[in-house]
Amino acid sequence: VLAAQSGLRACDVVRLELGSINWRTREICLTQHKTGEPLSLPLEPESGNAIADYILNGRPDTAIANIFLCHTGVTRPLDARSASAVISRHMKQAGVPAERRAFHALRRTFGTRLLQNEVSLELIQQLLGHRDMNSMKPYLSIDEQGLKMCSLPLLFRGEVGGSK
């Protein structure tokens, strides 16, 4: 839920610590692993509730600061590869085609949905934590319906309004 609603990279989700979430202001604050840049994102209620439920009811009682922990064997922070495997397994159960079962697909979908909801490119850039607008291009696929809304009608000869 968190990855889909925040667009965070797997490496950033697994590095989140208990102190990364400000429950009062409903914000997630982190330093991005890939860029080293600080990032503050809104904590959506559904994500916040899921994280709180995990912390209170599913997370082992440990001094480890990371929110998400590996529960098999020795308790340790979850790594990006394991997080990706969990996401892939859930996507498979949901019927997502194999070629689309990737943690990063959640990030691309997040960017695309923002674009579909007419969020400015500058804000999308900030939310994805990109320094350069060009690095956003792979995330901003335009849906077929949105493309059809931009097209102009094409009239052929003999049709009303067309040339003869």
Tell what function each PLM region has:
Residues 142-164:
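DNA/chromatin major-groove-contacting recognition/catalytic segments
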Residues 1, 24-27, 50, 56, ...:
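Activation on folded, globular domain regions of eukaryotic proteins
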Residues 33-52, 65-88:
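C-terminal catalytic core of Y-nucleophile DNA break-rejoin enzymes
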Residues 1, 5, 107-131:
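C-terminal catalytic core of tyrosine-transesterase DNA break-rejoin enzymes
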Residues 20-23, 100, 119-140, 145, ...:
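Short, polar N-cap/turn motifs at the start of nucleic acid-interacting alpha helices
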